[in-house]
């Protein structure tokens, strides 16, 4: 799968529609939301690429919030080298053209799919780790 950079994400954002109505069932996801596999419309999702560095066996769990945001905040920036973005695949909905970041949250006793829209205007931080 194609590895995406911060510049790639910004370029894709410039062509993404702003909050379109969609029948895909994903719903609003301006911050990270839990989405069961049954609700993920796999048939209409097109994988665009990954943010994961396949050369790194275990990506970092360190988060980056330079403006005091938190993981679940809709204003939290996309930081490709930091958690959870360093584990994400980017998809495009074939119906509404929305861009969606998705990763698997794996805890001790559960597995949870998380989704967040890569909306136009969402800050995307640089490609170099700080």
Where are these regions (language model features)?
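Short metal-coordination and nucleic-acid-contact micro-motifs, chiefly zinc-binding Cys/His arrays
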Residues: 15-20, 86-89
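Short, intrinsically disordered, charge-biased short linear motifs at domain edges
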Residues: 5-15, 76-84
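Short cysteine-rich clusters marking metal-coordination/redox-active sites
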Residues: 21-26, 93-96
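Short cysteine/histidine-rich metal-coordination sites, predominantly Zn2+-binding motifs
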Residues: 37-50, 106-117
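Short, charged low-complexity linear segments at domain edges
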Residues: 1-6, 50-78, 124-125
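Short, compact, well-ordered microdomains
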Residues: 76-130
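Cys/His-rich zinc-coordinating "finger/knuckle" motifs
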Residues: 29-32, 36, 100-103
């Amino acid at each position: 799968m194609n590895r995406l950079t911060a510049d790639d994400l910004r370029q894709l954002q410039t062509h993404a529609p702003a909050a379109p109505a969609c029948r895909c069932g994903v719903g609003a996801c301006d911050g990270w939301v839990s989405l069961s596999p049954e609700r993920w419309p796999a048939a209409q999702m097109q994988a665009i690429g990954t943010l994961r560095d396949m050369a790194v066996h275990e990506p970092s769990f360190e988060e980056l919030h330079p403006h005091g945001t938190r993981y679940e905040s809709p204003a939290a920036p996309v930081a490709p080298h930091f958690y959870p973005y360093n584990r994400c695949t980017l998809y495009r909905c074939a119906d509404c053209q929305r861009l969606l970041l998705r990763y698997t949250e794996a805890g001790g006793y559960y597995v949870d799919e998380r989704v967040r829209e890569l909306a136009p205007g969402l800050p995307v931080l640089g490609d170099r780790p700080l």
